[in-house]
Amino acid sequence: MLVEPFENELLRSTEKYIHSHFENEGSGHDWWHIHRVRNMALKLAENEGGNLFLIEMAALLHDLDDWKLNSENESKTAKWLKNINVDNLQAESILEIVEQVSFKGAGVENNATTIEARIVQDADRLDAIGAIGVARTFAYGGHKSRPIYHPGIKPVLHTNFESYKNNTAPTINHFYEKLLLLKNSLNTATAIEIAKNRHIFMETFLKQFFAEWEGDK
């Protein structure tokens, strides 16, 4: 489904707003993360289908109310969609997609219910793995002043969102608590294929990391 001219205007306004909002963000959830997720979501949609306006808008807005970045009770996403006069039904769909994007713990069921939500979720998860994923993981760990690694603190597979949200473990644990699990949590065939090499890269990185940690290399 092609994007209508008036929808394209809404997208460009949103892009400008999101760029200014996230331009100086330093935790790995910056404008360039959003830019990559948007581009990947549109790439996935070429093979998987879906409403391109909903996909691109949700990709642009997916971190605006993320719990890691926004502690306010009021939804900035809903407020923005209202301000630019997005159709009510479309706004509801976009908010639903955004709500379903985030990883909430290894034991929490994936609730992406539409092709648009599955695509945006996959695009976001692909940006959490591979070389970019490694870089973003350490950026976030540094942002939160977390140690890189502690041999005495073992990874935990969180069975609920509260446990996952309150986790303060070393950064290396995040690979085992989330990143290495993402390959098998993807929804679309296109994303699953892209994830293969990114997953291998992380495994190679961890092997090298632990060899250097022990002084073997």
Predicted regions, residues:
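His-Asp-centered metal-binding catalytic motifs of divalent-metal-dependent phosphohydrolases/nucleases
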Residues: 52-69, 77, 94-104
